[in-house]
């Protein structure tokens, strides 16, 4: 029986990192090429026919919208090929959740797409990357992974792209899905799903980036006591088409900042309220009258994922009500 064909797209990150010492935390992200990365985990060749491609060699703090577009278009090209059964993306963990969510909304296939990374570089004494990659291949070739949307595989857990977020700066169990929990586990290659994301994704998503070369500028502004209008005005002057306001509590702005955001909304910039709190939803019509002020509530998306969705929404419309519907849907 022929083995499934899987393409691994490498973007860099800690999983491709290398340092001078196995017992020190310093390293260079993206220093290891995809060929060397795959050669370090020979057991994956028993599972599938593996092909590797280098998309970028960066730490994920260097991720850009242009790389997202390049990545999404390449994933769509690969999955349109009959012989390609799944795609895995090796990625730094800093912005993995944003890349995963972007792909969740722009990939046009039911075939599995898995993002995987590491919290310790390959030169570390207890590197987590090799097992994470081995598990990612097992998830990718498992039939139950079909039509699950894009997933993240880290630390023996499977997380839906929409829900996953990085909650710890250094621990190997850095990822969680605070509002919903993980959707499955993978233990030494044994895959088990408990549930799946219920929000539209991949083929059910309305977003088409096939002809898009650049995404609209959207800035995130972080709320705090004694906040001002300075950052709002700076975002407008920089040409932002949208602003994500990471508000206090249920997405609440400081009064002076709220006045500036209201003016921005009236000028045609889309202002979306999110929260700096780590879980829960930013609800419509609570302390802030969104309809009156012209704001959008991002519901259960954190600020960084709300930015991704707003960037895509702005490729279709700048109408407040239409964008609110998009946030309520995705």
From Swiss-Prot:
Give the Asparaginase/glutaminase domain ranges: 4-330
Describe, as the record does, how this protein assembles with itself and its partners. Homotetramer.
**What family is reported?**
Belongs to the asparaginase 1 family.
Q: Give binding positions for substrate.
A: 93-94
Output the SMART domains linked to this UniProt entry.
Asparaginase
Name recorded for this polypeptide: L-asparaginase
Q: Which gene encodes it?
A: ansA
Give the Gene Ontology MF terms in alphabetical order.
asparaginase activity
Source species: Wolinella succinogenes (strain ATCC 29543 / DSM 1740 / CCUG 13145 / JCM 31913 / LMG 7466 / NCTC 11488 / FDC 602W) (Vibrio succinogenes)
A Pfam family (short name) is Asparaginase_C
**SUPFAM superfamilies, sorted:** Glutaminase/Asparaginase (SSF53774)
User: Source taxonomy lineage?
Assistant: Bacteria, Pseudomonadati, Campylobacterota, Epsilonproteobacteria, Campylobacterales
Gene Ontology cellular component list: cytoplasm
| Catalytic function, reaction form | L-asparagine + H2O = L-aspartate + NH4(+)
Subcellular compartments: Cytoplasm
Q: Which InterPro entries match?
A: AsnASE_II (IPR004550), Asp/glu_Ase-like_sf (IPR036152), Asparaginase/glutaminase-like (IPR006034), Asparaginase/glutaminase_AS1 (IPR020827), Asparaginase/glutaminase_AS2 (IPR027475), Asparaginase_C (IPR040919), L-asparaginase_C (IPR027473), L-asparaginase_N (IPR027474)
Q: Name its GO BP terms in alphabetical order.
A: asparagine metabolic process
EC number(s): the record gives 3.5.1.1
